[in-house]
């Protein structure tokens, strides 16, 4: 493989498409990024134009190679990672979408979800798909398109229409309509896939009236799915060899491939995933059961918990409260006081996610006394991110029976040393921050590289996974438990605040 010097990861996110080129040592040699339009037709509705997703993603690929003066014949393989759950339906003949992509954040299918609950499907969905009944997942979005685009369900039955998550759509376009596939991680987010039988679930397809003919073939996350020509006909054919949903790609990029290993991504919200190996653990604590990647990209399972407000609560301090002018300043102000002076901030601006799942919770600040100043509130807001992470982790440990030895972290907020140290303090666990922060792209690159022999195995990659800094707990157990019990008390008082009839 000597002439093939690079792997490309395509990272198709919610607000932008990126291409990341890596060399054999997993160093990033070139990055290109393009933002694209968010479409909000009605309150709570979110769409993307699938053609714009494709145009932005394909142009970043060309640009990233051009920037570093790399020829396409030097590329060993392409890996794809993507925003999960987002739905595209298109015509098999023309490759044209019949409707905009319905994005994971879109809430338009709430009524369909209520109907599934009324039909008594909730327990079955949790057991078969590992998910909760929520508009977040793909299945109800596909039903909505088939219900609202005239004649589409009949066309789908005749095999004229195809469905895919974003990975499937990109591969269809990259292979000129020759390949219609997805991987196990993306399939596990559709609410149409049986995560135990590893096949599309007929009961779910019947419940949502979705024809099987429109569904992609489901494959492993690390294998050659097809080839793409960069530079049109006569160009070099490059294998597309890795696919994983963004959070599963980050888990793999952090090399959390053994049972009990976990990562937390601190972005707008937090996404925590714990690998549970070959057993699918059904959560009794409000977590999702999902498919992750084992050491060779094979099927492993994971528990997943989402916190809605992480980086977003720091933005609130900046934009609405005007307590800081830059998110980076939060660390400086938080360290100007020795503690929060008894203050707790519960950032339940849009309700609370795992493990509470209370859409009626609202944000609150508790424990105010005359001596409290803005620095205490800034510090308490940062601390709330760590407390919410502990909430999810406690649920994971209770569900899995696995004690976590270290938490690997990534995402924008991990640059905040105060937050990372407090996270370690409040968990009583080591927190490991990697040298390379692009772990999502790294995961897609690793999956593709392993499939084509660019890297032989994970041992080779283990050496490249350098931990830039390790944070260790610096407070006593009694102090840790005392602070956490204060948080639990604060959360309890923020729950069920909003009047239901308003909702």
Swiss-Prot record:
It comes from Klebsiella pneumoniae (strain 342). One of its GO terms (cellular component) is cytosol. Activity of this regulatory enzyme is affected by several metabolites. Allosterically and non-competitively inhibited by fructose 1,6-bisphosphate (FBP) and unphosphorylated phosphocarrier protein EIIA-Glc (III-Glc), an integral component of the bacterial phosphotransferase (PTS) system. It catalyses: glycerol + ATP = sn-glycerol 3-phosphate + ADP + H(+). Keywords: Allosteric enzyme, ATP-binding, Glycerol metabolism, Kinase, Metal-binding, Nucleotide-binding, Transferase, Zinc. HAMAP family: Glycerol_kin. GO terms for molecular function: ATP binding; glycerol kinase activity; metal ion binding. It is an enzyme of class 2 (transferase). NCBIfam families: glycerol_kin, PRK00047.1. Glycerol binds at residues 84-85, 136, 246-247. It comes from the Bacteria. This is Glycerol kinase. InterPro entries: ATPase_NBD (IPR043129), Carb_kinase_FGGY (IPR000577), Carb_kinase_FGGY_CS (IPR018483), FGGY_C (IPR018485), FGGY_N (IPR018484), Glycerol_kin (IPR005999). Sn-glycerol 3-phosphate binds at residues 14, 84-85, 136, 246. SUPFAM superfamilies: Actin-like ATPase domain. GO terms for biological process: glycerol catabolic process; glycerol metabolic process; glycerol-3-phosphate metabolic process. Key enzyme in the regulation of glycerol uptake and metabolism. Catalyzes the phosphorylation of glycerol to yield sn-glycerol 3-phosphate. Gene3D superfamilies: 3.30.420.40. Homotetramer and homodimer (in equilibrium). Heterodimer with EIIA-Glc. Binds 1 zinc ion per glycerol kinase EIIA-Glc dimer. The zinc ion is important for dimerization. Belongs to the FGGY kinase family.
